[in-house]
């Protein structure tokens, strides 16, 4: 698979040698598309949301692991609706029924890697 952009980040846990690679541009692109598809945001609104602190580039192994432990859908909904978004009327913590199908199709159509790869 092809990746997008120069923002390929690799971090190593110095204690056990585990490594994680993050395709940061792909991660942001997936979140942007989720915001437009599932939160009904415009392209401009999505770009503005991606400027929030949730999406800052990680600078170390544990920051990267933190971002990888939730699906991109979760990060998109936090950006759109805030922490605890699932407690708001009209928002659910449940994934849309077509999410995994849409996600795989989006990555395939754009020839993208998964946003995270784990080694170790």
Give short role names for the model-derived ranges:
Residues 1-120:
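C-terminal alpha-helical interaction appendages
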């Amino acid at each position: 698979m092809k990746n997008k952009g120069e923002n390929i980040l690799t971090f190593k846990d110095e204690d056990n040698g585990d490594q994680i690679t993050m395709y940061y541009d792909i991660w942001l692109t997936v979140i942007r598309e989720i915001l437009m598809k599932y939160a009904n945001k415009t392209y401009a609104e999505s770009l503005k949301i991606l400027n929030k602190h949730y999406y800052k580039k990680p600078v170390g192994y544990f920051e990267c692991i933190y971002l990888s432990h939730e699906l991109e859908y979760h990060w998109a909904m936090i950006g759109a609706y805030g922490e605890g978004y699932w407690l708001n009327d009209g928002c659910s913590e449940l994934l849309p029924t077509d999410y995994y199908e849409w996600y795989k199709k989006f990555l395939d159509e754009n020839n993208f890697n998964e946003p995270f790869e784990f080694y170790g």
